[in-house]
Amino acid sequence: MDRLLACLLGFLLIASVGSHAARTPEQYWKSALPNSPIPSSLSQLLSTAGGGTSVNVGGGGVHVDAGHGKPGGTTVDVGKGGVGVNVKPGYGKPGGTTVGVGKGGVGVNVKPGYGKPGGTSVGVGKGGVGVNVQPGYGKPGGTTVGVGKGGVGVNVQPGYGKPGGTTVGVGKGGVGVNVKPRGKPVHVNVAPFIYNYAATETQLHDDPNVALFFLEKDLHPGKTMAVHFTATTAGEKFLPRSEADAMPFSSEKVPEILSRFSVKPGSVEAAEMAQTLRDCEAPPAQGERKACATSLESMVDFATSSLGTSHVRAASTVVGKEGSPEQEYTVTAVKRAAAGGDQDQLVACHAEPYAYAVFACHLTRATRAYAVSMAGRDGTGVEAVAVCHADTAGWNPKHVAFQVLKVKPGTVPVCHFLPQDHVVWTRSG
C-alpha cells in the first residue's frame, strides 16, 4: 500500500509539473494577475493555436494566416478586410490569383502562365497603393511602392540585385531604413528610451519618437502637441518562456542567432537584432533596474518583483484610428495613472526589434505616470500613456530628449508619450 501511495503521489507530482509547464503565456498572466486585464498591445503578440503562421503589423494593420507551406489556402487581410488575397490550392504559379481591397478598391487578376510581373499594375483607392513593375525587369529594378499619402514608400534603384540603395519609410518617418550599397555598414538608430545613449544626427531628424518627448509643464488640458503615434516594431509574437529561455540571447552568439532564424548577416534585420542585444546588455542608468523580457511570463515576473506586489496594472497607448498620421492633438484630460505618493515607481517595457517579441523593461524611480486623453485635428481620439522623469541627472547629456527640448540633465522633469506597442506597469492599489 505504501508503495502504491508513493507511486500515486509521484504521478500526481509529475502531472502537476507537466500541467504547469504546459501553461500558455495567457494562462500564466491570468494566474499571476487575475485582476489585471492584458492590454491589447500584448494580447496581439500571443501566438495563435493551430500551427498556422500569423503576422501582425501595427495594431492589426496586416494579418496573415498561411495554412500550408505553399500558397494553397493562403489568406491575407489588411485592416478590417482592407485587403483580401485568396490563392486557389494547386497553382504553383500565380494563375487564379485574386486580390480585393476594401469594396473593390483593388482587383488584381494574374492569368496562368505569366512567370514574370511584366506590365503588372496595382492601384488602391485614390492612389492609396500604387505598384508599377516595368516589363522585362526580372529583379527589383525600377520598382516603386507607395501606401496612403506616403504611408509606405519603397524605392529600389535599377541594377541593384541586393538591397543596395533601398529606402523604406513608414508613415511620415514612422520607420526609416537606409541600406547603403554592398560593402557599406548598415546603420540602425539607438532606442530613444534607453537613457545612456547619445542621439545621432539621423535620429534627431528622422525618428518619429523624437516628437514624443515634452516637458511636464505642458501636460494640461488645452495644450496642443504635434505627435505621430506609431508602433515601433513589426509585432513579432511572444515565444513561450520554455522556448525563449532555451534560445541563445547574447552579443557573443549573434552568428548562431542569425543562423537559427535564417537572418542574413549584414541585413537591416541582422543589424537591428544585434542592436537589441547591445541595448539589453547595456548597464542600467543611475537609480535604474533593467532587464530584457524575452517572454510574456518574464515580463510579468520582472514587473511584479520590481514593484514588490502582484497588485499591478499594465497600460498602453490606444489610438482610436489605425494609421493616423502625424498631426496636432489637443489634450482634453489628464489624470495620474498610479497609486502612491508624489514620486512614483513604475516599470516601463519598450518593444525592441527582434525575431520574436522582446521588451526592454526598466524600473525607474522619481517618475510619474499619467493617463492622457487627446483629440486629433482629424477627430481621432487617443488614450495615451505618458511618463515623466523627475530625475534625469544620470542620463547621457546628449540624449535625444535634451537636444529636442533644449534643457540640461537634472534641471526639469522630462516626459514622453508611449508608442502603441510599449507598456507601463504601475501599482494598482
Curated annotation (Swiss-Prot):
User: Keyword Signal: yes or no?
Assistant: yes
Q: Which InterPro entries does its entry note?
A: BURP, BURP_dom
Keyword Signal annotated: yes
User: Domain BURP: where?
Assistant: 213-428
Q: Where is this region: Disordered?
A: 59-81
Stored SMART domains:
BURP
Protein keywords: Signal
Please list which residues make up the signal peptide. 1-21
Q: In which tissues is it expressed?
A: Expressed in stems, leaves, shoot, panicles and stamen.
Pfam families registered for this protein in UniProt: BURP
Alphabetized PANTHER family for the sequence: BURP DOMAIN PROTEIN RD22, BURP DOMAIN PROTEIN USPL1-LIKE
Q: Give the protein name, as stated in the record.
A: BURP domain-containing protein 3
Tell me what gene encodes this: BURP3
